[in-house]
Each structure stands twice: as structure tokens, then as C-alpha cells.
């Protein structure tokens, strides 16, 4: 009895499943057939046709990006060339600067060691100028010794004035002491300054101021 019920149950479920499948089948097939043309027209364009405009835009953008990339590459290459050229120029200028410094040092040392045989003769001239100045100064000093305002003339005049001052003091002292009968002793002191004055006057002296 249980076997009969189980068989009937299996048969009923199978029949019901077939009916449901039959009920669902036409609807799906209808939707599948009608989905191709949702607008109702039979000659519509598919998704591949609708993507043509976007593809063209992508191609244009890709071309622009490629051109920009090439321009950037050219600018970088130009910058690299300029940088290399500037580096070479900098290295050349450094070498030139070092060479000039060495030449300057060598010339300076040569001028210090051999002042008379220098390249331009500047050290020899620099040493010759003070010597000429000292020689001229000595010549001027020797020539001015005989002038009225020279130290030699002033010294001679000072000595002459000192001798006259001593004579005046001696004469004043004798006058204060009074006259004496023996004039030999008085004349002897008076002659001493005269002899000194004459010896000093014999030297060349300048005129009076």
C-alpha cells in the first residue's frame, strides 16, 4: 500500500513539474524573442554599432597622448644635449682657469726672484724709483746747505750771535767793575772773544734775517 502511494506521488510531482515547465517555457521564449527589439522595430542596431563613436574618441585621445609623449621625449633629449654641452664648456673653462692661475704664479715667482730680468721690468723700475728719489733729495739737501735758510747757515749765525752775546756780557761786567789803569789785562780778555769770533766768522755764513 505504501508502494502504491509513493508511486502516485512521484507521478503527480512529475506531471506538475512538466506543467510548470510548460507554463514557464513560452514566457521565456517570448521574452527572448522580443528582447532583440525592445523598441518594437525589426531592423535595430546592436551594441557593437553603438560603440563606434566611443572608439573614435578613444583613438583621438590616444593620438593626442602619443603626440604629447613624443614632444616630451624631444624636449628631454634637447635638455640632455644642452646639459652635456654646458658641462663640457664648464670643464673647459675650469681647465683654462687653472692654466691661467699657474701662469700667474710662475710669472709672479719669476718677478720676485729676478727683479732685473722680469718680463715687464716692473720690479726693477719699482726699486729704481726710490733710489732716484733719494739721490735727488741728497742733491737738493747739498745744494740748499749754502742757502740762507739752510741748517748750516743757521748754525753759523747762531754761533756768531752767541759770541756777540758773550762779548756784550763781558763788556758790561767790566763797566760795572770800573776803569783800571792797566789796560793790558783788560784788553786781553776782550781779545779772546774777538779771536773766537774771527775764527767763526771765517766760516761761510748766510745773510742776516
Swiss-Prot record:
Annotated protein name in UniProt: Tumor suppressor candidate gene 1 protein
Coiled coil location: 70-114, 152-177
Signal peptide, first to last residue: none
Stretches with biased composition (Basic and acidic residues): 125-149, 174-188
Biased composition, class Gly residues, residue ranges: 14-47
Tissue expression notes: Widely expressed at low level. Expressed at higher level in testis, weakly expressed in muscle, colon, lung and spleen. Not detected in 3 non small cell lung carcinoma (NSCLC) cell lines with homozygous deletion of the 9p region, while it is down-regulated in 3 other tumor cell lines.
List of residues that carry Phosphoserine: 150
Keywords of the record: Coiled coil, Phosphoprotein
Region Disordered, residue ranges: 1-55, 111-157, 172-209
Gene: TUSC1
InterPro entries in the cross-refs: CCDC89-like (IPR043450)
Domain of life: Eukaryota
